[in-house]
Amino acid sequence: MFKTIKKIKYFYVFLIIFLFLIFLLSRGCVYDKKDLSYGVTFSLKQAESLGLDWQETYISILNDLKVKKIRLAAYWDEIESEKDNYGWDDLDWQIKKASEANAEIILAVGGRLPRWPECHFPKWIENIPQAEKNKQLLEYIELTINRHKNNKNIVAWQVENEPFLINFGECPKLDKGLLDMEIALVKSLDNRPIVVTDSGELSAWVPAARRADIFGTTMYRDTYSKLLRSYVHYPIEPGFFRFKKNITRLFSSPEKWVVIELQAEPWGPVPFQELPKKERDITMSLDKFKDMIDFSRKTGFKEFYLWGVEWWYWEWKVNGDGRFWEEAGKLF
């Protein structure tokens, strides 16, 4: 009996210590609203999939919303849709217009970049040996960096997008050695910081953060699970992200931490433009939008890139609902 009591004592001591450690590790700075900054991710592909004039949308983002931080993607399948035949016009134009608006640019390069299907490889690489694929990938990255590295508005290079998020997207298995080669290549070409990103809810962060000058996390609360065939609300509080940040800091030392993808659009079993408004509202209504902004402010981050600017514009121009566009405009 005494042994049982002793075991129970040890258990409670361990539990108290464990809970105390969680309390300590979930602490962190919560910045004042005036210290926060916001940007967006823009995808030409996403704008086109919504039936929008992507250039008109982009100009409105810069001139009407007055966004001063923007993440752009150098999609390999668009830049080099045919081997050695490069089409730079669209990316050049996006960078030029953002620079004219004096916006800071994060330029993402690699095979895996923002927006579905996650990986954006040109079709011509499908039937060539893996070693040659890797060589061609590095060549496209080198050409992209060299073409744009003299632009002072580019503040960082993002290498790949959520490379450690497995089982999501139509992507090959992660090759860590290749990822490290990509990062080393970009560092050899330019001294601006490297952004490496990871899933906020589904990944461990440490492998990505160890490779990053700037670590970027995603932040979602309402999604659709194909596995469960239902909508899912993550039962997490802002302290969850502070906890992960503090744990990750024990094993890595990025110079900067940002929320690179803050949910600000719906997520459903099919593309959201195919869903009725009532179903879109399940994962992103105006109230959820406001709540997400308030939630994110308490997570211990101070720089956020919202995910969904093309959707706000689509709601406004196609559906006559300008509320999201107007609400987002208050942040910039």
For each feature predicted by the language model, list its residue ranges.
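Active-site groove signature of glycoside hydrolases
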Residues: 112-116, 140-172, 305
